[in-house]
Each structure stands twice: as structure tokens, then as C-alpha cells.
Amino acid sequence: LQPASPVHIPAAAHALWNSDEAERVQSSSGGFFSLLARHTLAQGGAVFGAVLDAHLPPSGDVAVAVSGGSDSMCLLSALTEELGPMRGSKYVQSDLGDTFRQARALLEAGTPVLFSGVPCQIDGLLRFLGRDYEHLLTCDLVCHGVPSPAVFRAWLDTLEARQGSTVRQVRFKDKSHGWSHPYLSVTFADGGVYTEDFNRTCYGRGFGMQLFLRPACAVCKYTSVSRPADFTLADYWGLDPALELPVERDKGVSMVLVNSARGRAVFQELSPRFGQVERPLEEAVAGNP
């Protein structure tokens, strides 16, 4: 095994929102991932992120790392218009396929890479690479645990049987009822749409009760502020309700930890494109236990 990747402990948390309101509304929280992705793509780089199979576009602009599962890690290397499927939460384990090798080949060729994933995936990537690349940027997520793809598929089968049509799109956190009241939205091939408070669905309840997370999640070693990635992203649950923000809170606020010198440099470069308030790290931890 490769040595453990370096860990970083941030000094503070950032309550952050993308200045592009449309992009913010389309995102799970405040839209910071989109800023990182566009920054990388503008440099001629490549972005690795999770895409549900139901979302995969037919064009060659997205190179699909693996297909056939419920959630696949994909490489986006051309049109920023295809960024949409990478936005949003996916509450199911992703199939990394050959993405580590793809990332290494790109990095060896001098191509900037943004790799996003849960912290164990980022740590795995860094161990696989075995060395630092100055044009690699990583972001991990505050993770509740990853559900079994088999359970996810069984749940989709139930929805399809009830609707009599195949699922074409799943949005786990639709903001149509506001960021603080996330709704599940499932679109079917026949045009039908099923929406419900995610936490009231059987899948959402089981996820919240940790009934079908992968076994490794029970002994996760990444449940701390010591992070392997340059950035850590989450919803900013627990943000002081008395704090006045210059934007509408219920359109989404990201919790961002800047964990490295490389991350700080990119954060500063992107600062004209977002608003943010620096907050105590303890507040962010309390809101995302």
C-alpha cells in the first residue's frame, strides 16, 4: 500500500453561495462545486464527478468511465453545458471504474484535473497516484455514508412497477420547496413525475437510519476535520439562524472548508464569483455531526 495521504485541518469554515443565482438553485447547496469545475474546464482541464446513469448524455463530450450501475464516476473534459448531471447529491455508492488511471494519465500529460468524491475515494486516489501533482485539485464531501447500489436499484424497480414506466432522472434534493426542505423528484419515461419530501420516502428514511450503508461506513476514519482533499463541501446545516445574509438563504448555502495552500490560492482566485461569511469551525461541525 502507498503511504497515507497528507491530511489538512482548516482554521475556519465558510458559509458560501455562488453569485450566479441560476447555478446556485440548480445545485444541492450553494453551488461552489460548479465554480471549481468551471475554473478547471476554463484551463483546458478535466473534471471527475458522479453522474447517475439515468442522466448520462449520449454525446461524446462526457467520457463515461463505467456504465451499467446506478451511479458512475464520469470524466467531463469538454463542454461546460454538460456540467449539470454532476451537480446535486447522489445518495448511492458510485462506481469508480478506471477513473484513477484516467486521472493519472491526464496529470502525466500536464492536464489540470479536478477530482471530486467522498473522502475515502479522494484518499484512495492520492495513494494510487503516489506523488503530488501541482495541477491536481481535489474536493471531498461531508458524507453520511454510501447506500448499497443493490438497494437503490430495488427501490427504483419498485417505483417503476408502480408507475408502469422506466425512471429517466432522479434528483435527491430538488429545491422547489426550498433548500431547507429538500424534495425527491423522480421523472419517468412516460413524462410522469413523482415528488415527495425525501426524508418521508422509504429510501430517505432508510438512509437516515443507516439501514443499508456499506459496512465500511460503520468504521469510517474520515469523520473529522482532518481531510485529505483541498476542499471539503457540504450543506451548511447549523448556520446561525440569526445571521443576516445578503442573499435568500433558502436558495442554498454551502459549507466550505479550505484545507490546503493550493485550495487557498484557488479560493482567492474564485472569490469575485461568490459571496461568503467566515464562520467558526465548531459551528460547521455541530451542524454536520
Predicted ranges, named:
Residues Q2-P289:
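Iron-sulfur-associated redox domains of electron-transfer enzymes in respiratory
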